Amino acid sequence: MYHTPVLLKEMLDILSPQNGGIYVDATFGSGGYSRAILNSADCQVYAIDQDEYTYTFYEKLSNDFPNRIHFFINKFSKIQQILNNVQIKKVDGVVFDIGVSSMQLEDASRGFSFSKNGPLDMRMSTSLSGVDARMFVNTVSEVEMANVIYQYGGEKYSRKIARAIVNARNKNMINTTGELASIIRSVVSRSKNHSIDPATRTFQAIRIWVNKELEELEKGIACAANILNQGGKIIVISFHSLEDRIVKVIFKLLCDGKSVNLLNLGLGFQLINKKIIRPTAEEIHSNPRARSAKLRAILKL
């Protein structure tokens, strides 16, 4: 399963890769952004992904672009540390594509999908993080669970869902995505006016909690800002309002010259696009996953 990169043309237009440049693809996935960057200029790409399953895509890209793509299995919050270890101090651009990939959703064994039965896992990396979705649904208190589902999923029935999960686990441990989805659907019915599955928001919330995604995003952008050359760019494509809000706030802090995550960056930044860039109708038609994508970008002065 290949993950179709979203807003690819728009990302490339803004990044504008140059010969001799050094770029970071902070969310490598199946390598769509990395391939496009490498095709655009005679440059180097340092690619990061915490999902060890993405290594096979790196191998293919490495054969196509020998000595120009460098791959690291790690969290993108470690960008600075990763690059320091290979004596790279500054880069010309960092690209983030936030959230779960099509490959992860399609693989039932990863436990991300409510439409495919599999073990309750949801970890982006099975080697880097220990807490999984099964632990969340079977051990977290009802109050904390309801708060997570509400805050990270925007689910108005969060209390009802949390109560149903706790009632179910008191009888039998919840082990699969199918069991969890059935519990949620038993207390929340599908809206007549909306095609969204009742389990969608809860699964999103649990995934964000398991992977500490919002905390990772804050750290990742702050580290990226710290390693940019003058004229360097950070581009973030996000898929839901929580992520986009974090990007918007951090970019504003950077433009206002405020410190981010205890990093006092000194140099100024400016927004590249004042308004969010969204996919065209044509892209949404050919790749429905793109419909909620938002792109924000910032330039180091």
UniProtKB/Swiss-Prot annotation:
GO biological process: rRNA base methylation
Family from the record: Belongs to the methyltransferase superfamily. RsmH family.
Protein role: Specifically methylates the N4 position of cytidine in position 1402 (C1402) of 16S rRNA.
A molecular function GO annotation: rRNA (cytosine-N4-)-methyltransferase activity
EC number: 2.1.1.199
Keyword Transcription: no
Superkingdom of the organism of origin: Bacteria
Keyword terms, alphabetized: Cytoplasm, Methyltransferase, rRNA processing, S-adenosyl-L-methionine, Transferase
UniProt xrefs under NCBIfam families: 16S rRNA (cytosine(1402)-N(4))-methyltransferase RsmH (TIGR00006)
Any Gene Ontology CC annotation: cytoplasm
Class of enzymatic activity (EC top level): transferase
Main location: cytoplasm
Pfam families, per the entry: Methyltransf_5
Name of this chain's protein: Ribosomal RNA small subunit methyltransferase H
Organism: Ehrlichia ruminantium (strain Welgevonden)
UniProt catalytic activity: cytidine(1402) in 16S rRNA + S-adenosyl-L-methionine = N(4)-methylcytidine(1402) in 16S rRNA + S-adenosyl-L-homocysteine + H(+)
Annotated positions binding S-adenosyl-L-methionine: 31-33, 49, 76, 97, 104
Localization terms from the record: Cytoplasm
